[in-house]
């Protein structure tokens, strides 16, 4: 394959049932540029990697942890633009066309997309709207909004901090402090509602808001993950 313009980096953990559908959806994206797909499995069993049908996909394993996995993917990426995609999120069909035209004409170092949730329920539409509005106001999109960055800039700032939570927020805050800008497209990624459905909608919303507030108040991600695990065990007991 010629030098790819884009590298789509997908950290996974036990996504064997979902991964081939995701890869198929990525192959349908509208683009005139070459792109590569890199799947990074955080499971020692490599169960997701074993079921991938597409032999064009770059498959690697790493230590568990989204930040560690994304950094591992970025370390082997060849594309000029890195797209960090969650396994339960789909890009809009014109995503790469939009990124290509925008990045080539502007001095922004990267960006993300508005949030969409694959559900007809009004509550999810409200969650998506508020999430998109928040990221436009504070310029800190979350990982489920398909963050993309120029590879040279990503390497320059040292990639993701390998912390257990809030790696996306920490990266965006670091970019803001450096004086660089990111752009958020009105085009929407579509993410699965599964985490809200599995954990309980109200619980998930309140837990996430609590974590965000505590993080912005100065608690470290390592303290937050202890809270997360304790709260999760309490809910399951």
PLM features: residue spans?
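Conserved donor NDP-sugar-binding/catalytic core segment of glycosyltransferases
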Residues: 94-123
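A conserved acidic beta->alpha catalytic loop
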Residues: 41-49, 89
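Conserved donor nucleotide-binding strand/loop of the catalytic core
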Residues: 49-76
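Hydrophobic helical membrane-anchoring modules
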Residues: 1-3, 173-237
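Short aromatic/hydrophobic "clamp" motif used to bind/position activated sugar donors
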Residues: 82
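N-proximal low-complexity "stem/linker" segments adjacent to membrane-targeting elements
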Residues: 1-25
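Short, acidic, metal-binding catalytic loop of nucleotide-sugar glycosyltransferases
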Residues: 24-34
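Cell-envelope/extracellular polymer assembly enzymes that use nucleotide-activated donors
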Residues: 5-7, 36, 170
